[in-house]
Swiss-Prot record:
GO molecular function, one term: protein kinase binding
Domain of life: Eukaryota
Cytoplasmic topological intervals: 127-146
InterPro entries from the UniProt entry: JTB
Annotated transmembrane regions: 106-126
Location, primary (coarse class): membrane
GO biological process, one term: apoptotic mitochondrial changes
Signal peptide as annotated in the record: 1-30
Compartments where found: Membrane; Mitochondrion; Cytoplasm; Cytoplasm, Cytoskeleton, Microtubule organizing center, Centrosome
Protein name, entry field: Protein JTB
Stated family: Belongs to the JTB family.
Complex and partners: Interacts with AURKA, AURKB, BIRC5 and INCENP. May be a component of the CPC at least composed of BIRC5/survivin, CDCA8/borealin, INCENP and AURKB/Aurora-B.
Topology in the lipid bilayer: Single-pass type I membrane protein
Annotated source species: Rattus norvegicus (Rat)
Amino acid sequence: MLVGAGRRGLPRGGHLCWLLCAFTLKLCEAEAPVREEKLSVSTSTSPCWLVEEFVVTEECTPCSNFQIKTTPECGSTGYVEKITCSSSKRNEFKSCRSALLEQHLFWKFEGIVVGVALVFACLVIIRQRQLDRKALEKVRKQIESI
């Protein structure tokens, strides 16, 4: 059994580490990206942009309340771009990811990573102090026994 280990074999702060790891995994799971397959659904058999070249006629914009209710492409991301297919000349909507939304998700992720790093840095400092105290105590006992 390790020195300083509890009855169950984990150091005193071990349970806290397991809780933090579980919490971190839960956060990462909650931020899973939207699958590409669900980004666009059209009412026809297949959208023209899947099988032919297209030109973006209107950049990625947030959907209006009406578009959210009526256009299935708005459902997954809340953003849509208007495209024109080259061969068939059909105008369709295609779901897209907003640069602003991506930036927000990036900074949220970075904040979580920095927060987790700070927590674990504090845990390392606390553990190092515990080990230093134990080492000093051992040295003190050795000196007293002389």
